[in-house]
Curated annotation (Swiss-Prot):
Single GO BP term: negative regulation of Toll signaling pathway
Boundaries of every TIR domain copy: 162-306
Entry keyword Transmembrane: yes
Organismal lineage: Eukaryota, Metazoa, Chordata, Craniata, Vertebrata
Segments forming domain Ig-like C2-type: 9-108
SMART domains: TIR
Modification sites for Phosphoserine: S382
Residues carrying sugar: N31, N58, N73, N85, N101
Name of the protein: Single Ig IL-1-related receptor
Membrane topology recorded in Swiss-Prot or TrEMBL: Single-pass type III membrane protein
Length: 409
């Protein structure tokens, strides 16, 4: 029977080693449950707690609760709960329970620092700073990003039969003429490559639009209206602007209205109030005192409202001369190309024909030809290579020479 009583217990809890980080002042309950095989002649099983390999003595900082359950087949379940009050650093350590000198898995208690909010506060501040930077970059770079997207993926409006990029309507007063001809037109045409159609007439008259106005609008991709004080002072702007705007929206898509900062003062003109109410149908661009700078937001917003401009790369070279180091084979004299500037004058073997040398570049007076005596029967094959002229396509080059046949003469 002694062998039956020596059967090792089976620990149900803890099933594995556990490590618990607890702050000072906390209370923790450690549960040790084991299944043992018991007979009447076997000693009563008991649970003993060990701390760091030593038996746990009596103390006021812990308490024990033991329970026993007897089941069939002479088996018994014993449970012990150790409740610890972590009041000082000596209460931490490695705890194990033992039944019949057989130890269970361990509970390792280590001291954790007090729950602090420093990390959470720092993380929140970091997220807030990142959001502020993103918002600042969006405000500062929004127009640049939109321009980049338009230049890269925007719709190309080229083969639509239009002759002009924008129709510009303005008042026939000195201030508006100066603004359009000395600020708006140079910036859009010279710096940004747009083609404008300027006209100082009433664009939104009360009567039906004239045939000339319809034709001119049909030739332009966009419409720009300079809403200056002189433009708004016209009687129809206060009386029938709504009817004119409805008629204008039928003729062109999303017209562009240039307003001025001084017009924002109260009372607001009825036409401006109407345009702000229909902002989803029109484009309003505000001119400020600092908008004259080419890099200001005014020009960026105006360019976003205008069609996309396509930049063409220069052609690498004429296919006819690409294999000749981009030199015209008809202009190769004595094995090297005739340069426009910085080259001594070469004799022309045939001044009356089509094998002449390249003329002087812009602004330079023509170099007088030297009188030479050339016999018709002399051979000049060493001075000019014309062996492959018959196989070339001369119709592709019209800037330097032109070949004619006897029938044309």
């Amino acid at each position: 029977m002694a062998g039956v009583c020596d059967m090792a217990p089976n620990f149900l809890s803890p099933s594995e080693d556990q490590a618990l980080g607890l702050a000072l002042g906390r209370e923790v309950a450690l549960n040790c449950t084991a299944w043992v095989f018991s007979r009447p002649q076997c000693p009563q099983p008991s649970v003993q707690w060990l701390k760091d390999g030593l038996a746990l003595g009596n103390g006021s900082h812990f308490s024990l609760h033991e329970d026993f359950w007897v089941s069939a087949n002479f088996s018994e379940i014993v449970s012990s709960v150790l409740v610890l009050n972590l009041t000082n650093a000596e209460d931490y350590g490695t705890f194990t329970c033992s039944v019949w000198n057989v130890s269970s898995h361990s509970f390792t208690l280590w001291r954790a620092g007090p729950a602090g909010h420093v990390a959470a506060v720092l993380a929140s501040l970091l997220v807030l700073v990142v959001l502020l930077l993103v918002a600042l970059l969006y405000v500062k770079c929004r127009l640049n990003m939109l321009l980049w997207y338009q230049d890269t993926y925007g719709e190309v409006e080229m083969n639509d039969g239009k002759l002009y990029d924008a129709y510009v309507s303005y008042s026939d007063c000195p201030e508006d003429r100066k603004f359009v001809n000395f600020i708006l037109k140079p910036q859009l045409e010279r710096r940004r490559g747009y083609k404008l159609f300027l006209e100082d007439r009433d664009l939104l008259p009360r009567a039906e639009p004239s045939a000339d106005l319809l034709v001119n609008l049909s030739r332009c991709r966009r419409l720009i209206v300079v809403l200056s004080d002189a433009f708004l002072s016209r009687p129809w702007c206060s009386q029938s602007f709504r009817e004119g705007l409805c008629r204008l929206l039928e003729l062109t898509r999303r017209p562009i209205f240039i307003t001025f900062e001084g017009q924002r003062r109260e009372p607001i003109h009825p036409a401006l109030r109407l345009l702000r109410q229909h902002r989803h149908l029109v484009t309003l661009v505000l001119w400020k005192p600092g908008s004259v700078t080419p890099s200001s937001d005014f020009w960026k917003e105006l360019q976003l409202a205008l069609p996309r401009k396509v930049q063409y790369r220069p052609v690498e070279g004429d296919p006819q001369t690409r294999l000749q180091d981009d030199k015209d084979p008809m202009l190769i004299v004595r094995g090297r190309a005739a340069q426009g500037r910085g080259m001594e004058s070469e004799l022309d073997p045939d001044p009356e024909g089509d094998l002449g040398v390249r003329g002087p570049v812009f602004g330079e007076p023509p170099t007088p030809l030297q009188e030479t005596r050339i016999c018709i029967g002399e051979s000049h094959g060493s001075e000019m290579d014309v062996s492959d002229l018959g196989s070339r396509n001369y119709s592709a080059r019209t800037d330097f020479y032109c070949l004619v046949s006897e029938d044309d003469v």
